[in-house]
Regions:
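N-terminal secretory signal peptides
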Residues: 1-32, 58-59
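N-terminal export signals
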Residues: 28-30, 36-57
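A short, N-terminal "cap"/entry segment at the start of jelly-roll beta-barrel domains
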Residues: 59-135, 235-325, 331, 422-441
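Histidine-centered metal-chelating micro-motifs
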Residues: 145-148, 166, 185-187, 191-196, ...
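Mobile, glycine-rich extracellular loop/lid and propeptide segments
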Residues: 148, 157-160, 166-169, 178, ...
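Glycine- and acidic-residue-biased ligand/ion/polar-headgroup-sensing regions
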Residues: 152-172, 335-356
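Short acidic-glycine-tyrosine-enriched beta hairpin
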Residues: 172-190, 356-374
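Ligand-binding loop in jelly-roll beta-barrel domains
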Residues: 191-218, 367, 375-401
Length: 441
């Protein structure tokens, strides 16, 4: 630190004399200018930063060396199946550094609530504490079975994963929306709007629900059966205009939640039975994503983006379905407007996240896993399997927005890029100039 000390006393003639005389140098308490302070501070900070970078570089070299020799051996007990699915967490690449918090969980680890007619389980901030904006629920209904009439405090975005279902949702003005949906279709139920879901033939349905509250719990929704059970019979009779002995028979159980029932009539018959077009909702709450053309298609895969621009009722939740071919890369990017919650539909891949202060983490993902990326954190995803991998990118936002690193580099003057990356103009020209989203393997 001799250079730093010299810099600290360089502008002070008296201090120079003291230093040359060999006496102990003590900081002055008078006449110390702001310029002196800033000069000394910036030099010290630069030295500290250099020390930090050197230490990090040394850590990378140590990791590379350790992973090639006996240092990485583990003679103790291991959960071999788990390690097999997470090689990049067990032996991370040398570029990983520091801690960014949990970025992975799996629905296959979540407690499953099973009832006659189906089941449900969830991934929220209780098990993935970094995800404070969104919660995911995976639910199954057999043919005819209901997720009972209910409502809740969060918006509900959903994607059908399997089978067929009939959904209903009522607007506050009394208009009603009813529709049948199949695999790949979406729906959105606004917070506080009463709705229901019923499995259809031949084998019911399974779907992913995403709520715009990180601490949401599917066990805490407002249930029709509980409302009836805890309202006095006299009040129910007066409210519904029923005979006094009827309210006692209204609810089979205090909490239905999921329960079996007869299959419904046709969609046309259901719509006609409630008043047809006279009471039809002016808003469309389902979206046939399976019928839409890809928003972006490259040699490496495709992306379908659904947000408030093409599905207007999705004011708080935006989504992108990404399919990567083997070896393809979801390009290095970040999202300026929201953190990212992922659901892996098929295949397997690797995600790397790079944060500030040199923190970085790499994790492997498989079908039914949930991923998380902090807001504005740079990240990439690569297909590491021999088949296509597909995943959802979900955001608590009205629009899908991302910043492409390639796009940014090519919009800068070449001299600025060379100064940062130490490459010449011919190499810069090889970097894709437009946002690719997906780069082929």
């Amino acid at each position: 630190m001799k250079e730093v000390e010299e810099a600290n006393i360089g502008s002070d003639p008296e201090a120079v004399k003291v230093a040359e005389s060999g006496e102990d140098h003590k900081p002055r308490t008078e006449g110390f200018s702001r310029r002196d302070f800033l000069g000394a501070s910036s030099t010290a900070l630069a030295a500290a930063a250099l020390t930090g970078l050197t230490a990090h570089a040394q850590e990378i070299q140590d990791t590379r060396k350790a992973e090639k020799d006996h240092s990485a051996s583990d003679p103790g007990q291991e959960n071999t199946p788990l390690l097999g699915e997470n090689p990049d967490s067990n032996l991370p690449p040398p570029t990983d550094h520091g801690d960014i918090g949990p970025i992975w969980y799996s629905f296959d680890l979540a407690h499953k609530r099973v009832q006659e007619g189906g089941w449900t389980h969830e991934v929220n901030s209780f098990v993935l504490p970094t995800s404070k904006d969104l919660t995911g629920v995976n639910m199954r209904l057999t043919a005819g079975s209901f997720r009972e009439l209910h409502w809740h405090t969060a918006d509900e975005w959903a994607m059908m994963l399997y089978g067929n279902a009939r959904v209903t949702v009522m607007n506050p003005d009394g208009t009603m929306f009813i529709d049948d949906i199949s695999k790949g279709d979406l729906w959105l139920f606004p917070a506080g709007y009463p709705h229901s879901i019923q499995g259809l033939q031949p084998d019911g349905c399974q779907f992913l629900l995403v709520f715009d509250e990180g601490d949401f719990s599917e066990d805490g929704t407002f249930l029709f059966s509980e409302m009836i059970s805890h309202t006095p019979h006299k009040v129910l009779a007066k409210n519904f205009g029923l005979d006094k002995d009827i309210p006692a028979k209204l609810v089979k159980e205090e909490s239905l939640y999921i329960f079996p029932a007869d299959l419904p009539l046709s969609l046309a018959q259901d719509k006609a039975s409630i008043g047809g077009s006279r009471v039809a909702s002016p808003f469309q709450y389902t979206f046939k994503m399976s019928n839409m053309s890809p928003t972006k298609e490259t040699a490496g895969g495709e992306v379908r983006i659904v947000d408030s621009r093409n599905f207007p009722v999705t004011k708080n939740i935006a989504a992108a379905q990404v399919t990567l071919k083997p070896g393809a890369l979801r390009e290095l990017h970040w999202h300026p407007n929201a953190s990212e919650w992922q659901f892996w539909l098929s295949g397997k891949g690797r995600m790397g996240i790079i944060m500030n202060e040199g923190r970085a983490r790499t994790m492997d993902f498989n079908a039914n896993d949930v991923g998380f990326v902090p807001r504005v954190a740079a990240h990439y995803i690569q297909n590491t399997g021999d088949t296509d991998c597909t995943f959802l990118e979900m955001f608590k936002a009205d629009q899908f927005i991302d910043v492409s690193v390639n796009n940014w580099i090519r919009r800068l003057p070449p001299e600025a890029v060379s100064a940062h990356m130490n490459i010449d103009k011919s190499q810069i020209a090889r970097i894709p100039s437009e946002k690719e989203l997906i780069i082929a393997g």
